[in-house]
Amino acid sequence: TDQLPLDAIDVLFFCTAHGDTKKFMESHNVPEDLKIIDLSMDYRIKSDDHDFIYGLPELNRRATCTAKHVANPGCFATCIQLGLLPLAKNLMLTGDVSVNAITGSTGAGVKPGATSHFSWRNNNISIYKAFDHQHVPEIKQSLKQLQNSFDSEIDFIPYRGDFPRGIFAT
């Protein structure tokens, strides 16, 4: 984007590390009609400070279709919400929610690390960010959108699996 004027493009995809989209938006004169799709977590939580729509079609289909700015949901958040949103829509979430989910190595993010290499993951399953994963706030936000009375805990334990792609949640 440093070499191409922003008013010369139709859609801008941010496939950047968390925090970089927000920095870019604050430091550049972004045309009002430029469509933006952000894959980071910068704009997933609704706020009066931005006009990004949470882009989970199963939740916000109409708004996503007409939005200028779309915040792409997180991987675990998408998987978990696809199972829980029908319950929230029917007001069936009446207590704490417990989720165990395992992700393949492609869900490890953009920075390579010891735990993202196949030689380490092979025949291993490991827990990370138990009860403190960054996707929990966006899951809670979506559940409250459909079931305003939902105010329970989401006890989420994410695991790294020894397979390359996909997520399994229960």
Predicted regions located by residue number:
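Charged docking surfaces used in two-component/phosphorelay signaling
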Residues: 107-170
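N-terminal Rossmann-like NAD(P) cofactor-binding subdomain of oxidoreductases
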Residues: 1-123, 128-130
